[in-house]
Amino acid sequence: MRPILKYRGGKSREIPEFIRYIPNEYNRYIEPFLGGAAVYFYLEPEQAIINDINTKLIEFYQDVRNNFPRLQAELGTLQQEYERNQRQYVFNRNAEQDQTIRVENLNEGLYYQMRDMYNGIVASPYLNGTLYYFINKTAYSGMIRYNRNGEFNVPFGRYVNFNTGILTQEHNQLLQGAQILNTDYANIFNMAVDDDFMFLDPPYDCAFNDYGNLNMQNGFNEDEHRRLAQDFRNLNCRALMIIGRTPLTEELYGDYIRCEYRKNYSVNIRNRFNAEAMHIVVTNY
C-alpha cells in the first residue's frame, strides 16, 4: 500500500535497502516516529502502535481512521474547485497575448485561504485532516515550515493537480487496527513487549533535523540522540532503525550497525543538508 502524504525524509524508495532485515513474524508493529508512514503502509500490519510528536500530522491520520467519509467528501469538493480553477487559469493564460502580464490563478487565493484556516487565523468548516492534506499536497515542495509565531508559512506550490485519489478506503481499513498516539517516543518505548517489532526513523544528526515540526523548533540535538541511543539499548522488543551516518551515530550505535547505503536527496532546502548522504541500518537483534 502506498503512503498518503508527501513527507521529507520519507522511506518509500529506501525500503528495498533494509526490508531483508525486518523479521518475518511479530505480533504487533510499533513506529514511534511515524512521519509519512511509508514502512507502516508497506508492511500493512494488522496490529500497530503508531506515533508522532507532530500533532497536526497525527490529527490527519486520526481523521483517516475515524472520519473517512467526511474527509473524502470534503477533499472531493476541494478537488473539483481546484480543477475548475486550474482550467480557468489555463484558458486565461492561453488567451492573454501579452506574456509579460501575470494571469491570476484562483488556486493561489484558495491555498492562502486554506492556509489561514490551518493556522487558526480564520474559522474553518473543514476537518483538521482535510486542511492538513490540502496543505501537504499544494504547498511548495511539500515543505513543512513555521514562523516565529508558530504559523505555517510555506507559499503556494502552483501544482497543476490536487490528487485526492491517493487516499483510499484501504488506508482507512488498515488504520482501524492501529493505536494512533501523539506523545514523546519514550512513552511508546515503554509500551513495547518482547513479541513486538519496532521500526525507528528518528530525526537525523544534522543541522536541519526538525522536519518542519512545530514541536521540535530547536531540533533533535546531541542530548536527544544520546537519550534515544540509551533507550534503544534498553528496548524490550526487536527494533530496526534507519539513521544518517555521522561520527555521532557511529559512536552511539557501533556494533548494532548492520549495513549502510547511499541516499540521494531530490531537494536540498536552504542548503542545510547534503544532496547525497549515507544511511545506516541499526538493529538490536
Locate the predicted segments by residue.
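Mobile active-site "lid"/loop adjacent to the S-adenosyl-L-methionine
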Residues: 146-159, 204-224
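Long, positively charged, glycine-interspersed low-complexity recognition regions
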Residues: 205, 213, 218-285
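Short, polar loop motifs at secondary-structure junctions
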Residues: 33-38, 167, 243-247
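Class I SAM-dependent methyltransferase Rossmann-like catalytic core
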Residues: 1-24
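Conserved proline-anchored active-site loop of SAM-dependent methyltransferases
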Residues: 18, 29-43, 47-55, 133, ...
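Short loop/helix-cap segments at secondary-structure boundaries that form the rim of catalytic
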Residues: 39-44, 172, 190-193, 248-255
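A mid-sequence, solvent-exposed acidic-amphipathic segment
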Residues: 166-199
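Class I S-adenosyl-L-methionine-dependent methyltransferase module
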Residues: 46-176
